[in-house]
């Protein structure tokens, strides 16, 4: 450490308010799972060592020592537990930033998830949110972190009791890396016991590629550092030598999750490009799963050396896949920029995607409850592939699951086609914001009355992909919000003797009153209980138009079509008014806004709608 650094004074900093809340959440909500603190600290040490090794590929000055390891030293006499590594280390500013602040949104999301999670699921949230370091305060009254950045001669000690503040003090460390010293609480003595520590390491960190040593005290009082983990790359072993428990432990290690993997894929590819892959399909959904910014974090290794988890080894709609791909066909010093352009990676990506797709398809055909649960968790993102992955769109459509008006069970498109009525040439669907809203939509009335099944699509991407898929098994996909004459081809299965009003004069009267607010006004057979509905005449359906407007995309004005039900009492009454020569102008806008409300559309003038409705209701109320 330089003389300049030793002359610097200690600094006191306040935790950000978010860290204070986070510490309280972690310490109190996860108390019964305190052993995970060691898993998180060891995982952080391994990540730091991986990072230094990678950076040393392009800067030899950062090279790791030959005996690089993660060292765990319990000291019962001092009630201290030390975890040391030879990793990349942290600067003064990185210590303050990484250990003293956290994004406000991250804290809030973490708290919400923690409160909602079952007790057995809470530990997994620590790793998923990247806040594992703070788990140390479950077992320690004070935590000291001494770190020296690789390539620097300065070291600093970050210290805190987790009660609102931390200090940064100049320190000394002979080599780059980090030492974390936990000053243990009185009720945490078990974590100073070598046997207990070894069992935790075996449970959570046995397959970390770096050697983990544990300092043992012999009977004569001397100490010895002994190997505590196997340190063998699990994926390099034959499948016959790996137990399901070992697969599950490795999955939990690499994913920071606690669920059991839904499926495990372990294979070696040989040919033009050779690689070994160990991949997992999760059974539980991560907290940030639906974020578009989230990417797959499959680890790419070259000859067992971690290179990156940003290689995009599967398309974004497969971002739930976890695991490792290891190859000898790439150079160790390949840059991340060059990596994306290499044909080797392109071949690996294609092979991995094909294998994962095949596994999902195979399990879908088994049609067990396990797949339906998997689909409920991950189907919303898999359907992104219907929108963005032209190469695999048809295969995805073959195993995709959907809700429909037929029953509460999930169905496939093949199920739908097998039940199509004679003369039906299209697959009907309705998109919207929620399944409950779709089930009660006025758009379905005429289809239900004629026994025509309709797919109910309520995920965000459902507003987009039907346009790209366009057809399945030569059957076009058709939104029920499009104005079309399909319903007139089918007789109603429900007896309806209600007489329809003559709306020949009402239709043009409403159209004149509404002007360019609508494209047209039409009498319809699609309604059985509602008075009105809005539809579109080709182009994007109503939901897609709404999504495009929300996202700020420029789009031409697309006035809706207002369809009226000639059998509804309100429409009959308005038809009588027109026949008597009375105006329906005040009613026209209310009818259009009523149809918009039914469809979940925003009203252009909510105040005006309220006033008009109140005025119209005042007449009958006064009688």
Swiss-Prot record:
The keyword Translocase does not apply. GO terms for molecular function: ATP binding; ATP hydrolysis activity; ATP-dependent protein folding chaperone; unfolded protein binding. It is found in: Cytoplasm. It holds the Pfam family HATPase_c_3. Residues 337-546 are annotated as: B. InterPro entries: HATPase_C_sf, Heat_shock_protein_90_CS, HSP90_C, Hsp90_fam, Hsp90_N, Ribosomal_Su5_D2-typ_SF. Keywords: ATP-binding, Chaperone, Cytoplasm, Nucleotide-binding, Stress response. SUPFAM superfamilies: ATPase domain of HSP90 chaperone/DNA topoisomerase II/histidine kinase, HSP90 C-terminal domain, Ribosomal protein S5 domain 2-like. Residues 1-336 are annotated as: A. Its main location: cytoplasm. GO terms for cellular component: cytoplasm. Residues 547-623 are annotated as: C. Coiled coil: none annotated. Molecular chaperone. Has ATPase activity. Belongs to the heat shock protein 90 family. Homodimer. This is Chaperone protein HtpG. It comes from Gluconobacter oxydans (strain 621H).
